[in-house]
A protein has these predicted regions:
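ER/Golgi luminal nucleotide-sugar-dependent glycosyltransferases, focusing on the catalytic module
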Residues: 1-165
Length: 165
């Protein structure tokens, strides 16, 4: 039986999320037979999910920002080897009471993997997310103009990161 509530709550929900991933890797037949994983964190409906996934061309797909210290993770693609050798070893560093979130730990793992030769790319475009409140179980209001700005920013960011000068 899985007990996902064994840890100090001050560590945060990211700590619990990683514990779920670790448990799945160790106990799930499906996870043990799979080589690539797609994670959608949070209570999200990603409206352009298929478009993002159909345009993944590298081993790792993840957005990273805030001077490469924050791996924004509404939709990520990770190979199992990355999860086992980079992501899970960083897991114990999560402590939201100290400002160390799962996104910070994920960025450390991502940068270590890139330094070791993994290929990485930004998402094809920014995810268009319909978010659901965990407290009220209601959808947050979507702002179409905001989504358009985010989409164009993501295209520019991808161009700058991936252009060969």
């Amino acid at each position: 039986k899985y007990d996902g509530q064994w840890f100090d709550r001050s560590l945060g929900k990211g700590f619990g999320w990683y514990d779920q991933i670790k448990t799945a890797m160790n106990k799930s037949n499906f996870a043990q037979e799979s080589e690539v994983f797609v994670f959608v964190t949070g209570r999200y409906i990603v409206k352009n999910f298929e478009k993002i996934l159909l345009n993944v061309n590298k081993e790792i797909m993840c957005d990273i920002k805030e001077n490469l210290t924050f791996a924004f993770s509404p939709v990520v693609v990770f190979p199992k080897t990355f999860i086992l050798n980079y992501l899970l070893p960083e897991w114990k560093g999560i402590d939201e009471s100290k400002g160390l979130t799962m996104e910070h730990v994920q960025s450390k793992a991502l940068l270590r993997a890139i330094a070791d030769g993994y290929e990485w790319e930004l998402p094809y475009e920014a995810p268009i997310i319909d978010t659901i409140s965990a407290i009220h179980n209601k959808h947050y209001k979507l702002y179409p103009f905001h989504n358009i700005i985010i989409q164009y920013y993501s295209y520019l960011k991808k161009f700058v990161f991936e252009s060969k000068r």
